[in-house]
């Protein structure tokens, strides 16, 4: 047995000599160097010695479980060996100190090292233990050979360390990583061999001394003096343990689990695994009985930079329960409500003072102005009043203070009302012309006293009203001066509002982006350009001319050059199919785009998403011009139109805006609308013709260009340079 282990030992002598590696190892190494050229031979040798199986090694490397040395910081060879020996001796001493009572014999051998301060004992108790267990199993085999070398071992420590264990430097390397380096076999075995069989149980005792913090000297200082060296060895060991905790990958060998107490057992087991010699059984039996030393709980955690760089796994933050948040809110609310009454009362007082000041100022200003500006005076006074009435309502007051303050408020308000009420009545006729909001504001003017009891009037409402009424008082002047204008302005406002609403709604769904279309896009009733003519919102009994102008109105709002809708209608009239479709669509909503697709109906009902588009032509066979639906977006107003037609369009648009609201102006709109159309139609059709020819030309050019590009190989498959304004690419991106 000893010969065999000796052979394997020598075969794994220092890494620098690769000549002695057995062929199997060599083969593995070659394979690995081919696969991972950036790994140094040393690192690979370590791995190969650690895991027999090539697959596991490859797996470890690819998954990042095994790390290279330079990623941490590779101490130079000599330094490493020196460190190792120091560490090992230290560990032995640590253990020996713990076992002094039971093992006088082994003590004698190491007297020369006893100067190590006991403070470090706890630190190494695990590793020492495991290493002893580990060596214990071999000591009998090695004892004869190694007793002679023990005397040499301390002098030539640096050379010898490489050959220390049965696995030689492979182990040494790994020990460095695992932070639990074994005692050099030479010294350990010679020490232990005397009482190999007798002492075995004693070796399993846990260390007794408490752990103390290891001082952290940098590795650079290692060589300088011995004590520093020993301490730094410890520091390094602690760091390495930490490092393993960051990467527990370091293989079975370093399979140290994150918390130090668990280290002892897995290490001793994994070490025994890594020696395929027959001493496995004994080593394992030892390791199974060994118990972790509890003192190491207090071991300080050293961080390597590698550990620091590694992103920490964040402890999952417990989200605060919504209930708790609710309770916090309630608490805050309670606090606020207690503070509020006083604050509210203060505010009320301030407001009342302001109210008392403002009317006088306003009146002074007003008196300065000349009589012809009565109207503006009225409006100013009105606004002053509104301010008064609105302000007292501003603070939202809890019920109790309200009662108290209501008298305060009522008092100033009443006399003022007396002075201003005539003005308010004067304004009454004007109210008819004003929009509703203002009416409300003025009505509230008439009952200032009511405010104090009115608990529902919220602060915000009051303030916003104040602002509104203040600004709206201005338009009032003009309204009263030129009464004949009001109906028109009102109408314009309404029309504009309606148009804006329609516009907004339109953009909300249909084409947010030019050139964007989705499959079901045009089957909805509301899409104005493609189908503008059929979908105009008209009364069912409407005559044909009326349809025309309504269409005009709708397309006008959406910025479709109004001629187009009519073009569509004329085409429709020309083809019987389209006319029929149009009729149907006015009676009952047709789900699919007017074309005859017999089973489409069912799809549309059973699928939540739009239907496939077989190209525009497939869906809208009766829509003759090819890209009809896109026209409006791309050329909203044709540039080439004659000025007359343009002005006519402008007219139409304006009329259409009013048309929905003011029934009176409808006849007019229809008249001019139908007049202008006749002229424009021919023109516009000609233009359309040109436009489509031009587009086709462009498409051909583009296709040619794309083909050329594809041959050069510069363009990904299926992609022809995407041009937003071209029809060709539009449906696809």
UniProtKB/Swiss-Prot annotation:
Low complexity bias (residue ranges): 84-103, 158-171, 180-198, 206-223, 243-278, 382-404, 424-448, 457-497, 542-557, 580-590
GO molecular function annotation: DNA binding; ubiquitin binding
Post-translational modification: Ubiquitinated.
Keyword match Ubl conjugation: yes
Stretches that traverse the bilayer: none
Oligomer status and interactors: Homodimer; may form higher order oligomers. Interacts with the large RNA polymerase II subunit RPO21; the interaction is direct and serves to bridge RPO21 to the Elongin complex in a manner dependent on transcription stress. Interacts with RAD26.
Protein name stated in the entry: RNA polymerase II degradation factor 1
Species in which this protein is naturally found: Lachancea thermotolerans (strain ATCC 56472 / CBS 6340 / NRRL Y-8284) (Yeast)
Gene giving rise to this polypeptide: DEF1
């Amino acid at each position: 047995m000893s010969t065999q282990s000796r052979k394997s030992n020598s075969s794994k002598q220092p890494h620098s000599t690769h000549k002695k590696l057995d062929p199997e190892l060599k083969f593995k190494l070659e394979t690995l160097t081919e696969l991972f050229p950036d790994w140094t031979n040393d690192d690979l040798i370590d791995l190969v010695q650690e895991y027999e199986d090539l697959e596991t090694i490859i797996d470890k490397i690819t998954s990042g479980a095994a790390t290279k040395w330079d990623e941490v910081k590779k101490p130079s060879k000599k330094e490493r060996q020196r460190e190792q020996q120091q560490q090992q001796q230290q560990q032995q001493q640590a253990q020996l100190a713990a076992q002094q009572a039971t093992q006088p014999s082994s003590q004698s051998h190491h007297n020369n090292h006893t100067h190590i301060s006991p403070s470090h004992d706890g630190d190494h108790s695990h590793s020492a233990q495991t290493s002893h267990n580990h060596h214990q199993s071999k000591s009998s085999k090695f004892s004869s050979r190694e007793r002679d070398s023990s005397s040499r071992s301390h002098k030539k420590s640096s050379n010898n360390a490489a050959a220390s264990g049965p696995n030689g430097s492979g182990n040494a390397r790994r020990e460095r990583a695992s932070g639990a380096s074994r005692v050099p076999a030479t010294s350990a075995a010679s020490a232990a061999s005397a009482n190999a069989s007798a002492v075995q149980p004693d070796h399993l005792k846990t260390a007794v001394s408490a752990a103390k913090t290891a001082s952290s000297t940098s590795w650079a200082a290692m060589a300088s003096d011995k004590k520093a060296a020993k301490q730094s060895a410890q520091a390094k060991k602690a760091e390495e343990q930490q490092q393993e905790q960051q990467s527990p990958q370091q293989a079975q060998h370093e399979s140290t689990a994150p918390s130090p107490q668990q280290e002892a057992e897995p290490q001793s087991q994994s070490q025994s695994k890594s020696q395929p010699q027959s001493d496995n059984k004994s080593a394992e039996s030892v390791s199974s009985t060994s118990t972790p030393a509890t003192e190491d709980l207090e071991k300080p955690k050293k961080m390597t930079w590698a550990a620091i760089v590694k992103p920490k796994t964040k402890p999952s933050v417990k989200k605060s329960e919504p209930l708790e948040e609710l309770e916090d809110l309630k608490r805050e609310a309670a606090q606020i409500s207690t503070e509020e009454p006083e604050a509210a009362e203060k505010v009320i007082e301030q407001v009342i003072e302001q109210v008392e000041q403002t009317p006088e100022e306003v009146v002074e200003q007003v008196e300065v102005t000349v009589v012809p500006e009565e109207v503006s005076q009225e409006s100013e006074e009105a606004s002053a009043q509104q301010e008064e009435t609105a302000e007292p309502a501003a603070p939202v007051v809890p019920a109790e203070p309200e009662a108290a303050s209501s008298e305060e408020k009522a008092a100033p308000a009443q006399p003022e009302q007396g002075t201003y009420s005539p003005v308010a009545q004067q304004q009454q006729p004007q109210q008819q012309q004003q929009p509703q909001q203002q009416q409300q504001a003025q009505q509230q003017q008439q009952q200032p006293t009511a405010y104090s009891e009115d608990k529902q009037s919220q602060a915000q409402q009051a303030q916003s009203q104040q602002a509104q009424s203040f600004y709206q008082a201005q338009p009032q002047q003009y309204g009263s001066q030129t009464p004949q204008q009001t109906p028109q302005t009102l109408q314009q406002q309404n029309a504009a509002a309606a148009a804006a609403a329609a516009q907004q709604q339109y953009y909300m769904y249909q084409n947010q982006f030019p050139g964007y279309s989705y499959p079901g896009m045009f089957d909805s009733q509301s899409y104005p350009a493609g189908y503008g003519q059929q979908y105009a919102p008209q009364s069912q009994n409407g005559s044909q001319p009326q349809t025309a102008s309504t269409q005009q109105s709708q397309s006008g709002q959406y910025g479709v050059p109004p001629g187009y809708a009519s073009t569509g209608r004329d085409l429709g009239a020309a083809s019987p199919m389209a006319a029929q479709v149009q009729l149907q669509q006015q009676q009952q909503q047709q789900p699919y785009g007017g074309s005859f697709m017999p089973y489409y109906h069912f799809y549309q009902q059973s699928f939540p998403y739009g239907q496939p588009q077989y190209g525009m032509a497939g869906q809208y066979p009766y829509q003759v011009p090819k890209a009809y639906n896109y026209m409006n977006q791309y050329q909203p107003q044709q540039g080439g139109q004659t000025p007359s037609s343009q002005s006519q369009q402008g007219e139409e648009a304006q009329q259409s805006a009013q048309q929905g609201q003011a029934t009176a102006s409808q006849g007019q709109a229809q008249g001019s609308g139908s007049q202008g159309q006749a002229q424009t139609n021919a023109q516009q059709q000609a233009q359309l013709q040109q436009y489509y020819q031009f587009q086709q030309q462009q498409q051909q050019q583009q296709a040619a260009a794309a083909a050329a590009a594809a041959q050069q190989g510069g363009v990904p498959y299926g992609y022809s340079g995407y041009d937003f304004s071209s029809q060709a690419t539009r449906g696809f991106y």
